[in-house]
């Protein structure tokens, strides 16, 4: 999925295992046969703000009509971010490294609100915005989970060595956070940040957290492979959905249903036909598809573990016919970018590889976003594949490669795959055909 961000960090080395590997400098985009099977089954999804369950068709329709926010989980829900597959020692090791990094960077500690950052360190996922809830990780000393007493039921077992501190209405939970120079997580809401300011120097925790998670562990890479295969199975069914006379909204509803058959949750659905495809962040509309329309389909979901899929393909209603020069340039640009991926190369070099191909063909002004973004428990994270990001790629980093060309008022095209850096190149996690379909 296209987005806009910048940044840098100092990631650590990580091993990469399994999968289809493409050494740097020797990459070709394969044509993959249609998937032989697609899993199915009715999936119920919990609606934000309540206990009721809805069936797949009803939920997909709600997503397509924005009657339900598919991103919102019920408040105070708790689940383990990596199910039972992540060991206690893994989470304990992450917490210990966070403390070491705080000491190295001169921080008294970290304070993280509910979200992906807290989930990465503890396995906990919960929402509680009105009352202060946070993981407090001091550089030295006892790690604490601060919760309002009404949310005591969301706490984990004490197996991670985390002390649970509860507070009652009328008391000040902010006194439980150390004073001094504190790294604040991006998911801590502003109202709480403001109350933490007295007696503390608040700085972003991004650099510390990026160093922790930018290179994925083996288990994380396996989850990303699973997610990529799941979204590939959805893309395999897209051509049969794109028929003249159907609306983008109808197709988005179908895609939401299919994503839920393969994932726990729908993250996003983009169906941009004809001129709508020239807007990278178009979602869907009531525009009716016509024969020969180019259609950008960018879709993603998240697994029960919290890891995301994200893949874009461009289709033509009724079949492609002759491949346009624009699309061939885009195809070549993505291949050039993927060939560039290897340890030691900077993130901006991958962006430049795609951009040079597109610019040389005369389409440079129509490539209006970065080439990619990292992916994991967050849909968009480091490394951001963008000009100015001098972060060097290391084995275990996972990110999208998604150049696009957008002609205002006419059409757009984008190809997106998730790749993981290996010891000598990269592993391509998505394997749907990249030709115009």
Question: For the regions a protein language model found, what residue spans apply to each?
Answer:
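Active-site neighborhoods and metal-handling regions in enzymes and metal-associated proteins
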Residues: 78-437
